[in-house]
Regions:
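Signature of small four-pass
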Residues: 1-20, 123-181, 198-216
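Long, glycine/tryptophan/cysteine-rich extracytoplasmic
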Residues: 16-121, 188-189
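Individual transmembrane alpha-helices with interfacial aromatic-anchor signatures
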Residues: 188-200
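Membrane-helix boundary connector in multi-pass membrane proteins
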Residues: 179-190
Length: 219
């Protein structure tokens, strides 16, 4: 039913890599054909016509610590965990401070570090909320499906518990999305398909529960 669809969409959203899209990487504008997308915990780059080769991959992976890069012909496909980007800027700040630079001299770098680390926290909150919602959506789906198959494994859950599980599926997804949004650093990125899918999963879960509460199944 609707809760099962919410479960599938929730999984697609939490595991997807395109909650936000941008035309910039680390403050630099990318070429028109390049794609920069942000998931909850990592950013992804697809750069066609980049003359990708082993030397390019080695150089980028050495500079951008933690970044995973592969070539598809001339196309560069890169994934960089938000936590690794946070650490990258932190190491950069330490390097500049060791050189005697501080304050306004490295403000751009420290601001970038703050933003990258804030994105890590936002992604963590979003991930917890979405996964919590997905798990409850799975339980809610089983509560509806198993009795149809003659399995009474869920009968031990009291009615109030069933209501909490049903409302919690969409509620936790909503909470995760709200926390993620308000903890994100300011920027000009646009909504990606993953965010739309997450919104659909949350809306369907809440809608399914709302219908179940006010429209009895035998009517």
């Amino acid at each position: 039913g609707m809760m099962g669809l919410s479960l599938i969409l929730g999984l697609m959203a939490v595991m997807g890599g395109s909650w936000l899209t941008s035309d910039e990487f680390m403050g630099e504008e990318m070429d028109d054909d390049d794609e920069v997308t942000y998931g909850l915990n990592a950013l992804n780059i697809v750069a066609p016509d980049a003359d990708c080769d082993d030397d390019t991959v080695d150089a980028m992976e050495e500079f951008y610590d933690g970044m995973e890069i592969e070539c598809d012909g001339d196309t560069i496909i890169a994934t960089w965990a938000m936590s690794d980007q946070c650490d990258f800027y932190g190491d950069l700040v330490e390097t500049y401070e060791d050189m005697g630079m501080e304050g306004d001299d490295i403000k751009e770098i420290t601001d970038a570090e703050d933003d990258a680390c804030a994105a890590v926290t936002a992604g963590t909150m979003g991930t917890i909320g979405m996964w919590g919602g997905v798990v409850l959506a799975l339980v809610a789906t089983l509560m509806m499906v198993l009795p149809m198959a003659g399995v009474d494994a869920m009968d031990a859950i009291p009615e109030m518990g069933q209501k909490v599980i049903s409302w919690g599926a969409g509620g936790l997804m909503l909470l995760g999305m709200v926390l993620w949004y308000f903890m994100l650093p300011d920027g000009d990125a646009s909504m990606g398909t993953g965010l739309w899918i997450a919104g659909a999963a949350m809306s369907i879960a809440l809608g399914s529960t709302l219908i179940g509460q006010f429209i009895p199944a035998d009517e």
